[in-house]
Amino acid sequence: MVKHIWDSERAAQLPKGVEELVYRSNLIGSDRTVCNWGGGNTSMKTTEKDFRGREIEVMWVKGSGSDLATMKAHNFSGLKLDDIRPLIKRDQMPDEEMVDYLSHCMIDSKHPRPSIETLLHAFLPYKHVDHTHPDAIISICCADNGKQIAEDIYGNRFVWVPYVRPGFTLSKMIAEGVANNPHAELVLMEKHGLVTWGETSETCYQKTISIIQEAEQYINDRINQHEVFGGKRYQPLPEDKRKQILAGIMPVIRGAVSEEKKMILSYDDHDDVLEFVNSVQAPALSQIGAACPDHLVHTKRVPLYIDWNPETQDVHKLADLIKSGVETFTSEYQAYFTRNQQDGDQIFESAPRVILIPGIGMVNTGKSYAMSKVSGALYRRAIAVMKGATALGQFVSLHENESYHVEYWPLELYKLTLAPPEAEFSRKVALITGGAGGIGSAACRRFAAEGGHVIVADLNIEGAQKIAGEINDAYGKGRAMAVKMDVTKEEDVQSAFERAALAYGGIDIVVNNAGLATSSPFDETSLKEWNLNMNVLGTGYFLVAREAFKQMKHQNRGGSMVFVGSKNSVYAGKNASAYSSVKALETHLARCIAAEGGEFGIRVNSVLPDAVLQGSAIWGSSWREERAAAYGIEPDQLEEHYRKRTALLVNIYPEDIAEAIAFFASSKAEKTTGCMITVDGGVPAAFTR
């Protein structure tokens, strides 16, 4: 049940004007059962002074593409009402003309483009107006007997408006319906949503919430009298079993849905999702259509339902069904586009955004983790709507042609243009070992800065969490995650890749960077020291690369590995035989994997740094003293010593190595594998030959 959370004390402290609207909007948007992500809109009418100092009536309305839950004052657009109100006398107004007209009504050209539904707010005579998409209300609006149900709940207090796409015509229909019903307190838009109003921001909010609560109570009473979704077809698998299966199957799904463009995945196994996917009605009900027009751009018209029996069929069968299911969905989506397209339309990715798997839950796809979560959140709202609608009558949706025209509607697509452009590592996932160290953290930041999703793997979990937290703060929740990994432990490495699969669907880039270093004259090198170097830098690189290779093969979309070697990979360092030997091993292992990985599109290259002291745990250890002693200098003279021995007379920093790593991982090096790059300022003894 939605809750009334208006705080009168806080509201009283707000400046009069737009901040009141911001507060109300944030409250409404904070409950996704009331308002979809990015959907709905709010408004208020005020008196302002124009640039001449004259008082004019202004309507503040949500700007297109913003989200009620998080929007601020600058996300609203102010429009001159005296310029808008005369439009109601017109008989029609095409979308393009409406958008152009409203641009001339804005009090400030720097304001965002006003909402598609601006006229709906302007044509109603009330000071405050809310348009929302509550689950309970849409359940009524998407029931075949919805109008009758509305009469049972609201009597003569509502206006029912048949489905019309948002714009001038719908706005005029709503205004006329309200004007013709003196008892009207709300508008129900068929297959769409709710409109409410009030003379103060608080009374408008109260009306929105109370109207929804009435619907919820009515629907809950009916749900309790029915077998939800026709009853259970399957039992959900135990949680640990679900995760075990998903860890192996997510890369298969990711590969299947990434035929055209790479996708980031997320999964959802909330109780409401499991109730739906395991139900008798799910196979048919899920294919009827979208529960709300606002869902279409993010969920497509229907999900992919995998008809897998979790009680009798194995994971291999599930993988086969996913591959064939995605292939069928893709061809059907392309046919859907062809049947309905208009001049200028460009097809989206054909792969499903929502995949329903009995016993397991829901997998969602998107260009980023955030957008895959949006698809999932919206489909959970669709499940709630279908649950309510089927308790009232039959669930109905838009016809195919109208669904298409909403999905490809220029006014809806405009919102997508407001997102930042994709960068080099957008849609990709990079796992970096030693990610909390100097080079590792620089690589993590470099990938994130160009759109990548980053898994910061390190034995130092606190350091890894710090780096991941910084990335999420800078680029958004879900862009990075930290995993504890001891690269010498097979179970740690396998667990990290399983977590990568569960979090994002798999990996595209792996940077083998975890390291240490020791220094001893050869005849004083102990077996313990030798094994330590071999375990971390040899076995560790092998284990990480092997698990990466497996996951990349399962995805069947190629991939890139970058080994961080050393100048010592090609140069025999004095008093460092164990370290230098295993660094040579690393680069040859990289070449061996490159030779095997080519047929799968898996590239493997190496970056050979030298003397990267900044932020390095290695150089903060006894290694600094040991190397200084080897050169007969003081530890604090080491950095200058290294600079002077380079041909370019430069110091090398973590960001320099990160740049080379990024190059090998990028499309710029898509035809390069088995290669090495030295980033050492030019140490003649380490010139590759």
UniProtKB/Swiss-Prot annotation:
InterPro entries, per the entry: Aldolase_II/adducin_N, Aldolase_II/adducin_N_sf, Bifunc_RhaD/ADH, NAD(P)-bd_dom_sf, SDR_fam
Positions contributing to substrate binding: S566
EC number(s) from the headed UniProt entry: 1.-.-.-
Coiled-coil intervals, chain numbering: none
Residue numbers annotated as active site: Y579
Enzyme class: oxidoreductase
GO molecular-function term, one example from the UniProt record: oxidoreductase activity
Keyword field: Oxidoreductase
Family indicated by similarity: Belongs to the short-chain dehydrogenases/reductases (SDR) family.
Protein name as catalogued: Uncharacterized oxidoreductase YuxG
The organism of origin for this protein: Bacillus subtilis (strain 168)
